[in-house]
Amino acid sequence: MANKFLMALVLVLIFPVFAFAKDSPEWVANLNVAQETGQLAIVRGIKGSDAEFSFHVKDFDGKWSEIISCPAFIGKKGWGKTREGDMKTPKGVFHFTMAFGIKDFYGCKIGYTKVDDTNYWVGDSNSEYYNQFVSTSYYDDFNKKDSEHVIDYNPGYQYCLNISYNEDGVPRLGSAIFLHCYTKNKFTGGCVAIPEDKMAEVLENVRDDCIIIMDTDKNIRNY
């Protein structure tokens, strides 16, 4: 009996029981990327800057469950980012590289950085740190007008996850593409925005192996 209880406890700790979980749609389980990971974040474009965000987890038996679902906003000019400042959201398969934000947050499995006044996301294409998170305490040689002073982006950057678009920092290809909280606008500059409470839920659950796919409703099933 004790062994059975211990095994059940271990399973709960590894795969928590989600109060609002439901079976993921069949097409999610059939995605090629679903064979490569145990977590999927999906941004499915609806129309214009309107989208739907969902978060899915796979259990020991290979069954997928949807644990988060909510409306989302993408770039003001829709999909297909190709350059810095084009107000478009990139399409494709990505991962999350870091979690950070203005608010405190505890328990994020991939780590979490609470930002301070020294933190910028570098948008200066001439900088060796283009599309990277920096502190001016250690690096100050970049154009701050072209970069994002993270702590100023309230309420959007209360909680953030960096999406791995242009991870190699190719100049002028685009920077600072995040999953972040809603702002007063019903669009973004190229990021994906969801309600703050849902963003907190994502931070509670996201793991290193999480894959995020982003595209139109027409194309999202091709991944």
Please state what every model-predicted region is.
Residues A2, P16-P25:
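Bacterial Sec-dependent signal peptides at the C-terminal "C-region" and cleavage site
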Residues P195:
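Conserved "landmark" site that anchors the functional core of diverse proteins
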Residues A8-P16:
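Bacterial N-terminal signal peptides
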Residues M1-M7:
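Bacterial N-terminal signal peptides that target proteins for export
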Residues K22-G189, K198-Y223:
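Cell wall/extracellular polymer interaction/catalysis modules
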Residues V192:
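Residues that recognize and position ribonucleotide moieties
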